[in-house]
Structures are given as C-alpha cells and as structure tokens.
Amino acid sequence: MSIITDIYAREVLDSRGNPTLEVEVYTEDGAFGRGMVPSGASTGEHEAVELRDGDKSRYNGLGTQKAVDNVNNIIAEAIIGYEVTDQQAIDRAMIALDGTENKGKLGANAILGVSIAAARAAADELGVPLYNYLGGFNAKVLPTPMMNIINGGSHSDAPIAFQEFMIVPVGAPTFKEALRWGAEIFHALKKILKARGLETAVGDEGGFAPKFDGTEDGVETILKAIEAAGYKAGEDGVMIGFDCASSEFYENGVYDYTKFEGEGGKKLSASEQVDYLEELVSKYPIITIEDGMDENDWDGWKILTERLGKKVQLVGDDFFVTNTKYLERGIRENASNAILIKVNQIGTLTETFEAIEMAKEAGFTAIVSHRSGETEDSTISDIAVATNAGQIKTGSLSRTDRMAKYNQLLRIEDQLAEVAQYKGLKAFYNLKK
C-alpha cells in the first residue's frame, strides 16, 4: 500500500457563491483524491463547527482561509505519512488533533475535506470506484430519492414555513426510472405554476419557490403535477415528503408559522403541532416528515413518534446532527424512527458511517443528504450506495450542484448492472406495513 505524501487545501466557492474548502491528497504511488465541503443554511445548534474567518471586509465574514490554513499547516503535518487506505486512523488522528467535542479548533470543514480527499485517493490507489472502496462488493442498493421540488422556509422567499416539499418515486422499478419520473413531474409542476401566474425561479436546492396560499396549496399543486406527468400518487407511484425544519420557527414553546407566513400563519403548541402533522398525513399520501418538531423538543418528538411512527418516516436532522450521542438517546427514548446523514454535521467519514450503522442496527432508516450550499462533489452518492442506505436527499431536478449527485448515481447503476437494486417503498423498512 501507499502512504500520503502531500495534502493541500484551497478556498473555492459553493453553489451560493460563498467560500468553502477543496482539499487534495496525494500518495507516494501517484494516487490522488479531491474533496469539497458543503454548507448548510438552516443548521442544528449541535452541529460540528464550520470554521469561518469572520473578517467582514472579505466575503462578508464567510471566508474559510483559517480552515484552509489549518489543513495546510497543521493537519497536513500530522497526516502525511499515514497509509492512505487506513481511513479510520486518519479520521481518528484529526479528531484527536482538534481535541474538542465539536471540532471547533480546526473546523469540521477542514477535517471533512481531508477525510473525503483521503478516501478518494485510497480508491484511486486501489483502482476501484469510491462506493466500492467504502462499501466493498456488497455495495449494491441505489437509493430511493427524495426530491425537493418546492422550497420554502429558510431556503427561499416563499411565504411557507415548511422548508421542503418533496416527491418520492417509491413505485419506480429502477433508479434511472425514478429520476425520470421526478424530472417529468418537476417540468409538469413548472407548467402548472406558470399557468397560475406564479414564480418559477428556483431556490437554493433547485426547487420552485412560488407564493402559495399555504402548505396545503403546495401539496395540492404537487399532486396535480404528479397526475399531469402521467403518474399516480400513493404507495405504487409517487409519495410526498416534508422537511418542516421546525427549529426555524419554534420559539419559547410555540411553533410560530407567522415567522414565514405572516399574519395568516398559525401559532401552535407542541401537541397542536403533532395534531397538525397528523391531519396532513391523514389527508395526503405522505411517507416522510423531517424535523417535524424542534431539535430540543424531546417530549414533542416522543408524542409525534407515538402517534405517527408506524405510518410515516420521522426523520431527525437538526434533532440528531449525524451524531451517535443524540441518535442513541433517540433510539432509547423512541423519539423519531430515522436519521438524516449529513457528512459536514459530524466532520469525518468514519463518524458518518458509525451513525448509519447505529441507525440500521436499531431499525431506523438512514437518509444520506446534501446541504443547501453544495458543490460539484458527488461523494454523498457513493456513500449512499456504499452503505446500502436505501435513501438519498439531494435536491430538485435542476442546478448542476444537485444533478451532479443524480448523474453519479446513474453511473453507479450502470456499473453495477444486474447487481444493482432499487428498493423503492421497501427502503422505508422502519414503517410497519
């Protein structure tokens, strides 16, 4: 095997025009890997620290030169000489070098860039695809996509509190067909919005951000788009998902929809929030709800799980922040039944894989996810297949930063050929159907 001989980081821009890191790792045998780091807009308060410069005269304070310097001057010195295929040793060494619980010293963005680049260099060293290197020859499940075709909340200027309205093509026979279904529904939706005189500009994740009359108007319009594209809503066709991102409009025990929806918005207690979500589930073909309760509302999460946990996938994003400490508590207290996996919430591939493994062992599903600030890096596609996670959330059917992930999955499906599996509805193994 081959040792790491050089590590180099630079500042590049993400899909929102904000700085992020790109890291390159080189080995003595000439292998090479590059990793780029995403960034979130709505972030959980317990996430690992994304190190920013804070210099308002440069990139409005969002520069990442400190993190770049930490890679080039501190991490590189510690990691050069490591065997490139010893991912756990590399990641553990960086965690120890940082020495904080939340990676606040070196920055999770600095550490993650090296973690991804090292894995890619190792795959290059061995001459195998990244998903194969990370998951071995059992990596074969193409994920069911959750496609965010309507953006609300902090991801757009649309007056809707829920951050994402997603379509989930559970009835498609292959990933390739699932992607086609999604694209056709996306374009059907655009025609419907235009016919209503609504805005068809897209938000951060490639979905539309029209001024709907509320949540139900958004869902009804998506259902019309599904039908207009020639598909049907339901378990043998296309289902609906929400990312409520409730922490963005929760304050002092109140779920305050007026923050995004104005005077017409609701103000709900935790129990009323559960009632509202249950009402939506009874009315529409909803299969997944992410962050339906605030990240610190553990009692609310337990009530929600008791009421809906056998019918709907209840995903903890801000709630768990890809951290096994919070996930373990959620499993123990029966709060949610799924975890969203975001590599930059925790900061290394090793810890990411540990969270996925813990979830699966508990019967929780794990959904590999992008961030709203993305790059052309498609590592999450390989992670989804490597872990046989079965689900991915990587945006709408527009914007190259989103399509890069879908296109990589098409390549992987082609490479796997007859071995490839698309689970569709069966990817939601946490539901008692």
Swiss-Prot record:
Pfam families: Enolase_C, Enolase_N
Protein residues bound to Mg(2+): 243, 290, 317
Cofactor(s) the record lists: Mg(2+)
Keywords: Cytoplasm, Glycolysis, Lyase, Magnesium, Metal-binding, Secreted
Family matches, as SUPFAM superfamilies: Enolase C-terminal domain-like, Enolase N-terminal domain-like
Record GO terms (molecular function): magnesium ion binding; phosphopyruvate hydratase activity
InterPro entries (alphabetical): Enolase (IPR000941), Enolase-like_C_sf (IPR036849), Enolase-like_N (IPR029017), Enolase_C (IPR020810), Enolase_CS (IPR020809), Enolase_N (IPR020811)
Active site: residue positions: 205 (proton donor), 342 (proton acceptor)
Similarity comment text for this entry: Belongs to the enolase family.
The name this protein goes by in its record: Enolase 1
Organism this protein belongs to: Lactococcus lactis subsp. lactis (strain IL1403)
